[in-house]
């Protein structure tokens, strides 16, 4: 699996997803339901592209990355 993508591409992709998320919440969907669907969509796409084992290996690293604050949007980075 690719280790990195250009920061601009990641930022743009995240912006598209967050815009769709905001629209879904506005339409009345529960954020937990959106999150579950987003995780399923992301993982199923990655499995189709890379296979189950590489995706499972990537997912096994998620707890440490979460605890390190990598997914905390409110954090300040310098």
Which positions does each model-derived feature cover?
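Solvent-exposed interaction surfaces and binding hotspots enriched for charged
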Residues: 1-78
